[in-house]
Amino acid sequence: MAAQKKKAQDEYGAASITILEGLEAVRKRPGMYIGSTGERGLHHLIWEVVDNAVDEAMAGYATTVNVVLLEDGGVEVADDGRGIPVATHASGIPTVDVVMTQLHAGGKFDSDAYAISGGLHGVGVSVVNALSTRLEVEIKRDGYEWSQVYEKSEPLGLKQGAPTKKTGSTVRFWADPAVFETTEYDFETVARRLQEMAFLNKGLTINLTDERVTQDEVVDEVVSDVAEAPKSASERAAESTAPHKVKSRTFHYPGGLVDFVKHINRTKNAIHSSIVDFSGKGTGHEVEIAMQWNAGYSESVHTFANTINTHEGGTHEEGFRSALTSVVNKYAKDRKLLKDKDPNLTGDDIREGLAAVISVKVSEPQFEGQTKTKLGNTEVKSFVQKVCNEQLTHWFEANPTDAKVVVNKAVSSAQARIAARKARELVRRKSATDIGGLPGKLADCRSTDPRKSELYVVEGDSAGGSAKSGRDSMFQAILPLRGKIINVEKARIDRVLKNTEVQAIITALGTGIHDEFDIGKLRYHKIVLMADADVDGQHISTLLLTLLFRFMRPLIENGHVFLAQPPLYKLKWQRSDPEFAYSDRERDGLLEAGLKAGKKINKEDGIQRYKGLGEMDAKELWETTMDPSVRVLRQVTLDDAAAADELFSILMGEDVDARRSFITRNAKDVRFLDV
């Protein structure tokens, strides 16, 4: 995208807006349009409005997008594009009202207005209006400022304001709390998405501001043992009228995808200095790719179509993979880096340690599924494959030193793959000697229905023993682990598969790993990681999550992985049943409530702090952590694969400074990280 705004040669006006249907169904079934009414659906409202602004940038008419999380819970999105049309539409009402009140009304249906766009522009913004209590629009176009307000989706009347030579649109909305489970936006979630959009649109500036940071939320560090004197009424009044503190971030990447790859690899050791960067254009198609190999063992390839994150890949990724595998094998054979008698390197061998971003722009995209996470255009595969064949061949020929390093890494990966295959076969042979082909230490459940079955992966033999005794053996299976499993972030697959604990987990789940993974063979639809509530327990949980993320990611993507929440405290009352607390705050609350109710706590061991799961007997473990009617399970989600990839690299990788910096920044944040 050129940083300079394109002249509005193409007509984007009332005639460009096409209506397909009305808004009636949105409030009745919001999930059909935004996925859910939870936190994810709430943030989807922002994405819809931001997509509009970014589409103006993609078309060459906007250079800056400003997003503000307003103090009162609303959101403001502004761009310096052409402005939403205000002229009277063929339907007899102002065009802005058509865009805001009619579903499937937008300029994206008119190829003259937008050659390429992410999703159908007018669709999203009308859905935002339908699911908001109030929406305000301010427009600069046709020589004037214009404004319109929508109360419960109904327009109050378009107003013409002062003359102006500027152009652009500003949309403010307040999500309806009667529709959404929460109306609180997460700053980091918004920041990650906007950063992604800035990477994908070279030269675009996106500013994010959060006005919700008030004086009460600012905590100063304690620098002495002497507390400050209480503030006077006048001082407090002055503070309340002072401007609120805000936090803001600006995203601007002149290098575009090259900067994106640098960002992905910043916590990893690149094995060649230059970043491979190329693009190509065809009829109705464009592709841009940036890539660089690192010394790690995990592939980190992220794909986008019209700036939409295609988590499930699609034809653009297929074309890239096919070309990369072909080019590297040909180069390796031609340069005798691979002997003629040697088998070809596989795609997995070549992509080990690869960080890449693939961005295509398609005039008529076909997305598979409602969530638009897989690109289906068959012609895109051959287009991307052709461009990649030409450009990658040129890069390998022009950079023989770097090319040799890449090929040698792939050859080393192939050797590890062969060793891993032998390790897999060993796992299978070993499994066959166990009863039913399952690990000997697995206490399986009686149910044969995976949908009703749960597997508890438990830290330590002692806790495993209590879990086996306390479980409901009809549907709960127990797999105890002895000590810490291998850190898969720092080990190649052949070493990983030699680890006894990893073998037991893979065999128990039944799905296989990597290219052999088959979710249809999953033996338990709930996989519960149960570890001590201390630092060691959290480390073991992270090791397990890293294994699942790197080797069996669809388990997380399909919502099968959970974290158990064992209690931290047991309160023993005299002449009353004991109570369990899962945090210091809950302990204090239960204690205060009990004492107010006239209960008496045991004097000697009234409050017991559990140091580990092994301290609980079978009955306590069932009552607090395993009984479906009372237990607390945290589902592990994967909202952003790139962010999760970065998180695991920081927490479990080789870069000590990056890990220390992350821990320092997040030490005060006691919320769980949804990875």
Swiss-Prot record:
Keywords: Antibiotic resistance, ATP-binding, Cytoplasm, DNA-binding, Isomerase, Magnesium, Metal-binding, Nucleotide-binding, Topoisomerase. One of its GO terms (biological process) is DNA-templated DNA replication. Changing E623A: 18% supercoiling, 11% decatenation, 131% DNA cleavage in presence of norfloxacin. Heterotetramer, composed of two GyrA and two GyrB chains. In the heterotetramer, GyrA contains the active site tyrosine that forms a transient covalent intermediate with DNA, while GyrB binds cofactors and catalyzes ATP hydrolysis. Mg(2+) 1 binds at E459, D532. Residues 453-567 form the Toprim domain. Changing D577A: 37% supercoiling, 54% decatenation, 126% DNA cleavage in presence of norfloxacin. This is DNA gyrase subunit B. The gene is gyrB. One of its GO terms (cellular component) is peptidoglycan-based cell wall. A type II topoisomerase that negatively supercoils closed circular double-stranded (ds) DNA in an ATP-dependent manner to maintain chromosomes in an underwound state, while in the absence of ATP it relaxes supercoiled dsDNA. Also catalyzes the interconversion of other topological isomers of dsDNA rings, including catenanes. Gyrase from M.tuberculosis has higher decatenation than supercoiling activity compared to E.coli; as M.tuberculosis only has 1 type II topoisomerase, gyrase has to fulfill the decatenation function of topoisomerase IV as well. Changing R482K: Increased susceptibility to fluoroquinolones, half supercoiling activity, no fluoroquinolone-induced DNA cleavage (makes sequence more like E.coli). ATP binds at residues 12, 52, 79, 83, 107-108, 114, 120-125, 169, 370-372. When the enzyme transiently cleaves DNA a phosphotyrosine bond is formed between GyrA and DNA. In the presence of quinolones this intermediate can be trapped and is used as an indicator of drug toxicity. DNA gyrase is intrinsically more resistant to fluoroquinolone drugs than in E.coli, mutating it to resemble E.coli increases its susceptibility to fluoroquinolones (most quinolone-resistant mutations are in the GyrA subunit). Gyrase from M.tuberculosis is usually assayed in the presence of potassium glutamate (KGlu); KGlu stimulates supercoiling but inhibits DNA relaxation activity, and has concentration-dependent effects on GyrA-box mutants. Changing E620A: 15% supercoiling, 19% decatenation, 143% DNA cleavage in presence of norfloxacin. It comes from Mycobacterium tuberculosis (strain ATCC 25618 / H37Rv). It is found in: Cytoplasm.
